[in-house]
């Protein structure tokens, strides 16, 4: 049949359970009632194209009429049990329940049409047309009653005859009908034969027997081929009945799922993280439940819950099969024969079971049937008291379920049986029924078997012992069956002593097996017997001998099934034989009983359909013979379902989910795959899965082993899912998803690890590891530490196995190291073998974690081999830590004694030995590794020591020697290169090798060797080189100057562009190249992006040539280069976008200055938003919220974040999730917002969130946080006596930022967390003030080493960067030998002034480096850049011979590299000009008095620095040498005025008078322009903002020079001061101070308020009067308004211009406004003014950064109270000057608080401005 039958099955299944539980209508029992519909449907299905024939319809009516006969049973075969009359329920009773119901009319109409159909007054087609809607509504009502949760409110019209198909029935008569059934004792008795004699009934075609009960359903499942014209009839039925049925079905499934979730959750529970973040791991079922509660869609089909296989009996049906237990005879002694035992009397057996006692069970029915033939005609009433339970204890079930209570409730008197005596049942039938109990769990089985054995031994031998398969023997009755059969079979002596005979008869089989239970192992499963088996059967026999090979861990122990063992995969003896045709045909001739066993599974037709379909579903069904299920299925099912109340009460917690699971699985089995489409199947699968979770056995019965992969796939897809942030402020969904993922990982990782161990899914492992790497460190730590040790170790092993496929990204390496370290903590002992096994993960470990391995680690050759294999991925600090372990004397002795084998094995670690140790290597040791050193990645000091032993300058073939040195040639001096192989060929092998050194950073582009290379290139000419050859010179490109570039063609320049991306092009070169390479028209986005390395060359001309539409889309490629732009270039970009609508010309003719109308809305590119001044940041709250996903990620400045926070008007009750959704915008949070957070927990969560922002926490907010925290902890201020427990939960970043006064209160563990963080990120330490750094270092030392004890080597290594901030006393506790071995580490640390001074003194002590007069080159190599810690006098004492050109260049280069590094830049060491001058004095000055000063060449300048030479020496340089070193002169900030004039004189010789300087030349001269006079400055062409900004960026002009620059620009441009716009004000830079105060007053306040962002970042050399005028511009209407109205963000925006605010306005500033001042603004306030405007309470409100910025000149003007206030702020309240006692200190604090109240009225004067 082409059309789907699934809607019909749903209809039938909805009727079946509903009728069973609600309406067995007397004579029209379930059998008869359903036979009507089933036969009718089967008739429709089998109908041919023509109309139904008269004969077929007559047969159908005969079947129907026989089904509706009241109170009559057909005569059964001779010997069958008599029919038993079920209780009657008349049709009248049913009609009574319909009175008053809205369904009265449609139900009567349905009944009438049914009668008309039966009377042939109506055709089936007409019947469907008239009653389709009523039938569909009836099905929906019955299904709604079946599914828990109640039907939804009807929204469709009521059903009527000929009405619409989409309708509903009220079904208000169902409850009344239920009550009626209960009142009429509706439980049916058992009937053992069909209502119609199958031998007399006629089929629809006149030949086949008529179906009974569900044979109509069998016809549906095996339909005829073609329907022909009746197909339309089926289609109509499907459309009318199926659609509403499926809709109701889906609604019911939804209700089931939702109601089950809470119920299953209450049963199973769910692991949740506790307060400490730890979570006790759940199991697989809890993981699946968690997923369904968190909207994960499990693939139920892949898990096995939609497999379509019949379900095994659940615990509920196991309970149904128990019934009332029977008393059993005591077991005889083992040696007594069964035939000698006393037989159990049937009369005695029936004495205790006079009638079936409800609720019924299979065993009760069987005993009842056995006793019927010996009873009198009128049986006595059954007893009214329950039978006691059996005295013999029952074997407990093997499931993990609780054992049900078998105590029966008081019985209810049933209907008496018929009074007419019936013939006794056939003994064969009765004893065939005993086969049920050979495999039954029912307690009555033992008594039944004994009785059948004693009364009918022949039938017992034939039915049980001869036909029951070996594998079916199971359960508690197995021992009794063995004993009973052993007594009936021939003596065991008939068992042959040798091999098992063929054929194997049942007698021989039972005799042999019962004689010895190990028959299979001892006789069949031996080598000789196996060889005797035919070859085609050997595999099967071997499988039987071995038994099923199941993984016990996959399926927890549950009950056994009818096959005697667990058969989840069909691997049992019986199923394997029946399913294998070859095996079946080979065994049946010898074992005849197999044919009976395999009838059902092999499709035999000698059993009823219902038994074949439902047999596996119900407990203890018989494998042979006719069963009650076939003879009378309706009463049988009613009898079982009548026991539901008792069995539900016995297991109340599992009754509902287990019952639903069974019904749902039965429904799935009957419907078949694909029912209702994918949506319905998914809902059904989820309901099935959910209902199986509480029952361990139901779950594992269905769960497939391959379902583990599906679980991993679903979890992996969920972890990879990125939840979109919903519109609006509430982003709780996406954040909730992140929290759910965290909960999943925290609570179910052990389950996932176990699944991964079994499935080996690399994709799932990679996904899981990625999720771990994204977890916060503290959450990851809690996860790993709360897992079982074995589970964590197994997961680490799994990672190691799949390491090659995990593909960790560079950004994830730190997190991977953290994860690896946590997993290592689960190992009780770290061994060398473990190190070798996990060697791929070693590069990710932090040094402390690496040092947890035993010290003897490196003594293992395999460990050294593992280090060699993975050294390329290891960090330098890791290699340094391991290299230091090589120096342990107990391992390998002293360095000069190390053998060659050790040196080769430890080669990757040798470059990381301390230099003082590496210098101990002898020339013989070095030469032994001659071929290995070039790849060893040596540092400069180590490389020079190796070169001294390897380079032989007397050899003739110097080029070969240099090539053999490889990378070591990078460290050769120019003199050595000149003696070995003079450089001459731009493309020669030596030259190319040196260029590679420059490319990887080993060779400095500013060094002397690089200068030699440049000379080769210049001498040969760049025009002769091809573009490819020219590209290799890109590392030296900045040193080529301008002239060389002008000689190159455009093709050569374009070819070099890709190579310039990693090079630092000078601004002058960028201007030149950008102008040459930028297309004059039709510029595309791709062309602009290709020029992005040249973006610092942006000029007015090039910017004008770039179309605005191209700039709009260029953020992706230009964004990373914006940080290299000057302030003026940024202003020009902003002005380009701002000028788009409403432009007005404010300038003179020909000099049109485009000025945007104030307040004009502008759309900015995303990358420019963080660069906008506040005046241009016109974003309203709606725009912010609409684009929150973008704005939350932008790196807003402090003042921008504060400004936008005010714009958003964030409510005070905003949740943490919504705050997190703001991202970097939350950095603008105000102190008032923090103070209004009531809960301490919420407060700490918000603080943690702020400290996780990449933009950091501004100083004012930080001060607010700690003040508020102390207040909340109810601690006395300013001194805390105790520390609350909340601080132990603070993040490590907060602990690092802890105020000084709280450091002493922290625990040792907290301090160590800070130390570890500082080691990993020293930049965060350098962001602290010097006082804070020293306090932290001293507190860490106090934790590591007791006071006044020497500091050990381990303590120094643990302190890391904190060593540089120790005080004098602590520094002197370092033993000098340990200090000597630690010098290489100190060279990479920032050193505080105190420590550096003390270190310089310690270096001169004898155990360290000794007196400087005795230093050699080795001592200088060891000291490195630490030589600058010496005094200038000590440096001058170093012998000139030790400071040769090569040594001096390397020493200065190392220090320059340090200064240019990120740590060096943040360190900001003091000026070292005098020390550098003392260091190079031996080269710069003549060797003896009276000798002429040397004239430097460019090589000498590169070997030292320009400022080391005097003006006379500079002026005497050769012009070519000066041109080659021009970039060095222009970039040296140490040149004095005389040296600048001398250098500028050389530049004028080179390029002519200043009036001819081109823009790129002016830019290249840089600071040298200060050497020009006022008249020469006026000759410069200063028309556009590009040239003007070149001068505006230079600091150091005199006042006359400033005036000359500004006046020249105004004159040449023809502009008036009032017409200066945003761009030109920014371009003026420092030179803005060249305008007189009266000129400054004419500047547009609107334009200046925008330029204030850039001008305020400069330390302007303006006078106090000029600063006041600039500040006045900002309070005008075009600016920011009155100072009193300014928020902290405006003070931060204007920077140093705030120093010009009048005294009265400054003195009226409030705490928040004062904290908005930048530290630079604090430092530039004139000292007298600073002392006047700020009182002590205002000074005490300074942040720590502001207080540290107070200059000594300002402190000198302060009063004692003011200085104490500054000290208070610097030390954050910890230290009060000693002359102020404790009481005075508190008095000062109280006075501070009171002074604020006095200061508030003063603020009103700010309105005067």
From Swiss-Prot:
Disulfide bonds: none annotated. It is found in: Cell surface; Cell projection, Kinocilium; Cell projection, Stereocilium. Glycans are attached at residues 63, 200, 295, 352, 364, 467, 516, 580, 605, 696, 860, 952, 1000, 1213, 1308. Its main location: other. Residues 1-22 form the signal peptide. Residues 376-426 are annotated as: Disordered. Residues 378-399, 407-426 have a biased composition (Pro residues). One of its GO terms (cellular component) is cell surface. The keyword Glycoprotein applies. Strongly expressed in the inner ear, detected in the testis, and barely detected in the eye. Detected in the six sensory areas of the inner ear by immunofluorescence. Expressed only in the sensory hair cells and associated with the stereocilia, the stiff microvilli forming the structure for mechanoreception of sound stimulation. Keywords: Cell projection, Cilium, Glycoprotein, Hearing, Signal. It comes from the Eukaryota. One of its GO terms (biological process) is auditory receptor cell stereocilium organization. The keyword Glycoprotein applies. Essential to the formation of horizontal top connectors between outer hair cell stereocilia. Belongs to the stereocilin family. This is Stereocilin. It comes from Mus musculus (Mouse).
């Amino acid at each position: 049949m082409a059309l789907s039958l699934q809607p019909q099955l749903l209809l039938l299944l909805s009727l079946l359970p509903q009728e069973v539980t609600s309406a067995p209508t007397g004579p029209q029992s379930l059998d008869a009632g359903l036979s009507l519909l089933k036969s009718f449907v089967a008739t429709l299905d089998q109908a041919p194209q023509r109309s139904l024939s008269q004969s077929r319809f007559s047969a159908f009516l005969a079947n129907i009429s026989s089904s509706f006969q009241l109170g009559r049973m057909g005569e059964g075969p001779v010997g069958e049990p008599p029919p038993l009359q079920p209780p009657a329920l008349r049709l009248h009773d049913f009609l009574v329940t319909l009175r008053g119901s809205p369904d009265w009319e449609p139900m009567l109409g349905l009944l009438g049409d049914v009668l008309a159909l039966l009377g042939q007054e109506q055709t089936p087609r007409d019947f469907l047309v008239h009653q389709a809607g009523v039938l569909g509504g009836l099905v929906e009502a019955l299904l709604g009653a079946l599914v828990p949760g109640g039907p939804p409110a009807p929204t469709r019209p009521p059903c009527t005859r000929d009405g619409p198909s989409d309708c509903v029935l009220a079904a208000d008569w169902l409850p009344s009908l239920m009550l009626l059934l209960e009142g009429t004792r509706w439980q049916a008795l058992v009937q053992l034969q069909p209502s119609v004699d199958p031998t007399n009934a006629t089929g629809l075609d006149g030949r086949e027997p008529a179906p009974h009960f569900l044979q109509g359903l069998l016809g549906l499942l095996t339909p005829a081929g073609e329907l022909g014209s009746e197909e339309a009839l089926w289609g109509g039925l499907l459309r009318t009945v199926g659609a509403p049925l499926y809709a109701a079905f889906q609604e019911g499934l939804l209700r089931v799922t939702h109601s089950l979730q809470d119920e299953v959750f209450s049963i199973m529970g769910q692991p949740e993280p506790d307060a400490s973040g730890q979570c006790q791991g759940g199991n697989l079922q809890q993981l699946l439940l968690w997923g369904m509660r968190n909207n994960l869609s499990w693939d139920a089909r892949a898990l096995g819950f939609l497999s379509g296989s019949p379900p095994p009996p659940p615990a509920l049906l196991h309970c149904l099969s128990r019934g009332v237990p029977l008393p059993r005879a005591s077991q005889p002694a083992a040696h007594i024969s069964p035939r000698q035992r006393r037989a159990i009397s049937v009369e005695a057996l029936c004495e205790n079971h006079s009638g079936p006692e409800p609720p019924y069970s299979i065993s009760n029915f069987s005993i009842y049937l056995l006793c019927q033939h010996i009873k009198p005609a009128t049986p006595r009433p059954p007893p009214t008291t329950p039978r006691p339970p059996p005295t013999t204890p029952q074997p407990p079930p093997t499931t993990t379920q609780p054992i049900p209570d078998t105590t029966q409730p008081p019985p209810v008197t049933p209907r008496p049986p018929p009074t007419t005596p019936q013939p006794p049942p056939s003994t064969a039938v009765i004893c065939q029924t005993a086969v049920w109990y050979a495999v039954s769990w029912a307690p009555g089985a033992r008594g039944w078997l004994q009785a059948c054995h004693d009364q009918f031994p022949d039938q017992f031998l034939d039915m049980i012992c001869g036909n029951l398969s070996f594998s079916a023997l199971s359960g508690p009755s197995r021992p009794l069956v063995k004993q009973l059969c052993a007594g009936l079979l021939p003596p065991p002596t008939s068992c042959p002593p040798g091999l098992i005979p063929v054929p194997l008869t049942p007698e021989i089989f039972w005799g042999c097996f019962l004689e010895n239970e190990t028959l299979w192992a001892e006789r069949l499963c031996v080598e000789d017997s196996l060889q005797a088996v035919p070859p085609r059967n050997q595999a099967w026999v071997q499988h039987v001998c071995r038994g099923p090979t199941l993984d016990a861990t996959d399926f927890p122990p549950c009950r056994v099934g009818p096959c005697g063992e667990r058969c989840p995969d069909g691997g049992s003896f019986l199923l394997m034989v029946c399913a294998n045709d070859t095996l079946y045909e080979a065994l049946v001739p010898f074992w005849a009983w197999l044919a009976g066993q395999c009838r059902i599974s092999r499709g035999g037709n000698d059993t009823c359909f219902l038994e074949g379909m439902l047999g596996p579903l119900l407990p203890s069904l018989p494998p042979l013979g006719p069963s009650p299920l076939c003879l009378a299925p309706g009463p049988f099912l009613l009898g079982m379902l009548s026991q539901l109340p008792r069995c539900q009460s016995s297991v109340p917690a599992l009754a509902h989910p287990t019952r639903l699971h069974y019904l749902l699985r039965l429904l799935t089995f009957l419907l078949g795959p694909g029912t209702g489409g994918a949506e319905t199947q998914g809902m059904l699968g989820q309901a099935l899965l959910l209902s199986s979770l509480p029952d361990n056995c139901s779950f594992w019965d269905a769960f497939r082993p391959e379902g583990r992969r599906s679980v991993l796939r679903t979890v992996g897809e969920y972890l990879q899912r990125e939840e979109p942030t919903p519109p609006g402020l509430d982003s709780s969904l996406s954040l909730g998803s992140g929290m759910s993922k965290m909960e999943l990982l925290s609570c179910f990782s052990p389950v996932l690890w176990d699944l991964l161990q079994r499935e080996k899914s690399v994709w799932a492992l990679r996904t899981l590891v990625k999720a771990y790497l994204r977890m916060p460190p503290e959450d990851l730590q809690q996860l790993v530490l709360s897992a079982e040790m074995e589970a964590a170790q197994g997961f680490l092993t799994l990672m190691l196995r799949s390491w090659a496929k995990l593909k960790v990204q560079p950004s994830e390496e730190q997190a991977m190291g953290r994860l690896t370290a946590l997993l290592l903590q689960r190992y009780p002992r770290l061994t060398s073998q473990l190190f070798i096994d996990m060697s791929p993960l070693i590069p990710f470990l932090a040094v402390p974690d690496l040092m947890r391995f035993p010290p003897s680690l490196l003594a293992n050759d395999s460990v050294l081999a593992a280090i060699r294999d993975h050294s390329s991925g290891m960090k330098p600090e890791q290699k340094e830590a391991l290299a230091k372990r090589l120096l342990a004397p107990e391992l390998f002795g002293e360095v000069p004694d190390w053998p060659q084998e050790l040196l080769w094995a430890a080669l990757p670690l040798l470059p990381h030995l301390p230099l003082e140790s590496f210098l101990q290597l002898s020339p013989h040791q070095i030469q032994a590794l001659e071929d290995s050193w070039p790849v060893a990645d040596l540092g400069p000091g180590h490389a020079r020591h190796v070169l001294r032993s390897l380079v032989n300058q007397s050899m003739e073939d110097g080029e070969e020697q240099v090539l053999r040195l490889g990378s070591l040639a990078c460290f050769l001096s120019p003199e050595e290169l000149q003696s070995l192989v003079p450089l001459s060929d731009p493309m020669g092998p030596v030259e190319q090798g040196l260029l590679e050194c420059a490319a990887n950073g080993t060779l400095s582009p500013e060094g002397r060797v690089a200068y030699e290379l440049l000379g080769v290139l210049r001498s040969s000419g760049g025009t002769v080189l091809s573009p490819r050859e020219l590209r290799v010179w890109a590392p030296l490109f900045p040193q080529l100057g301008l002239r060389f570039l002008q000689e190159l063609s455009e093709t050569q320049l374009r070819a070099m562009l890709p190579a310039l991306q990693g090079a630092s092009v000078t601004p002058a070169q960028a201007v030149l190249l950008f102008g040459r390479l930028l297309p004059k028209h039709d510029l595309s986005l791709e062309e602009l992006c290709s020029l992005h390395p040249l973006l610092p060359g942006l000029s007015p001309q090039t910017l004008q040539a770039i179309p605005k539409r191209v700039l709009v889309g260029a953020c992706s490629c230009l964004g990373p280069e914006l940080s290299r732009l000057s302030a003026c270039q940024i202003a020009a970009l902003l002005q380009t976008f701002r000028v788009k609508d409403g432009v007005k010309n404010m300038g003179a003719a020909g000099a049109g200055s485009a000025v945007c109308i104030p307040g004009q809305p502008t759309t900015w590119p995303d990358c420019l938003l963080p660069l906008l001044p506040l005046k241009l940041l016109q974003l309203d709250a709606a725009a912010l919220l609409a684009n929150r996903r973008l704005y939350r990620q932008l790196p807003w400045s402090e003042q921008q974040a504060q400004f936008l926070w005010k714009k958003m008007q964030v409510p005070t009750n905003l949740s943490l999730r919504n705050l997190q959704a703001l991202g970097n915008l939350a950095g603008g949070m105000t102190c008032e917002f923090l103070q209004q957070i009531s809960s301490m927990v919420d407060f700490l969560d918000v603080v943690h969130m702020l400290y996780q922002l990449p933009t950091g926490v501004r100083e004012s907010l930080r001060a607010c946080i700690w003040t508020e925290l102390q207040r909340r902890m109810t601690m006395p201020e300013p001194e805390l006596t105790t520390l609350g427990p909340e601080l132990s939960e603070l993040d490590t970043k907060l602990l690092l930022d802890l105020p000084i006064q709280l450091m002493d209160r922290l625990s040792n563990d907290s301090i160590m967390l800070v130390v570890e963080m500082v080691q990993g990120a020293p930049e965060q330490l350098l962001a602290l003030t010097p006082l804070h750094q020293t306090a932290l270092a001293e507190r860490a030392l106090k934790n590591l080493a007791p006071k006044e004890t020497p500091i050990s080597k381990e303590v120094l290594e643990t302190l890391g960067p904190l060593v540089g901030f120790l005080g004098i006393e602590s520094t002197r506790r370092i033993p000098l030998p340990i200090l000597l071995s630690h010098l290489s580490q100190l060279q990479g640390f920032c050193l505080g002034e105190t420590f550096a001074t003390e270190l310089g003194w310690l270096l001169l002590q004898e155990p360290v480096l000794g007196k400087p007069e005795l230093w050699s080159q080795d001592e200088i190599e060891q000291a490195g850049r630490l030589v600058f810690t010496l005094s200038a006098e000590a440096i001058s004492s170093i012998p000139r011979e030790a400071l040769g050109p090569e040594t001096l260049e390397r020493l200065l280069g190392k220090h320059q590299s340090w200064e240019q590094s990120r740590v060096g830049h943040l360190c900001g060491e003091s000026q070292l000009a005098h020390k550098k001058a003392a260091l190079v004095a031996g080269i710069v000055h003549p060797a003896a008095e009276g000798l002429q000063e040397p004239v430097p060449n460019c090589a000498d300048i590169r070997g030292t620095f320009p400022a080391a030479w005097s003006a006379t020496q500079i002026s005497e340089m050769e012009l070519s040498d000066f041109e080659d070193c021009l970039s060095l002169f222009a970039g040296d900030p140490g040149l004095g005025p005389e040296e600048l004039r001398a250098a500028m004189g050389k530049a004028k010789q080179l390029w002519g008078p200043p009036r001819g300087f081109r823009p790129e030349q002016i830019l290249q001269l840089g600071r040298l322009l200060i050497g020009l006079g006022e008249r020469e400055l006026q000759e410069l062409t200063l028309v556009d903002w590009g040239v003007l900004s070149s001068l505006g960026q230079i600091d150091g002009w005199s006042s006359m020079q400033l005036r000359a620059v500004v006046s020249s620009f105004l004159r040449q441009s023809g502009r008036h001061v009032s017409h200066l716009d945003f761009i030109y004000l920014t371009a003026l830079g420092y030179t803005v101070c060249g305008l007189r105060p009266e000129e400054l007053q004419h500047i547009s306040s609107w334009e200046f308020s925008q330029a204030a962002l850039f001008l305020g970042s400069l330390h302007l050399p303006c006078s106090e009067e000029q600063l006041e005028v600039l500040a006045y511009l900002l309070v005008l209407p075009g600016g920011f308004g009155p100072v009193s109205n300014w928020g902290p963000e405006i003070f931060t925006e204007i920077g140093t211009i705030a120093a010009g605010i009048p005294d009265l306005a400054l003195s009226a500033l409030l705490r928040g406004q004062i904290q908005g001042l930048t530290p630079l603004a604090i430092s530039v306030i004139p000292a007298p003014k600073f002392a006047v405007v700020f009182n002590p309470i205002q000074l005490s409100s300074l942040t720590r950064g502001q207080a540290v910025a107070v200059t000594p000149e300002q402190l000198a003007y302060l009063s004692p109270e003011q200085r104490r206030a500054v000290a208070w702020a610097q030390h954050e309240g910890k230290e009060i000057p000693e002359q102020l006692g404790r009481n005075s200190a508190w008095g000062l604090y109280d006075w501070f608080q009171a002074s604020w109240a006095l200061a508030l009225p003063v603020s009103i004067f700010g309105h005067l401005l």
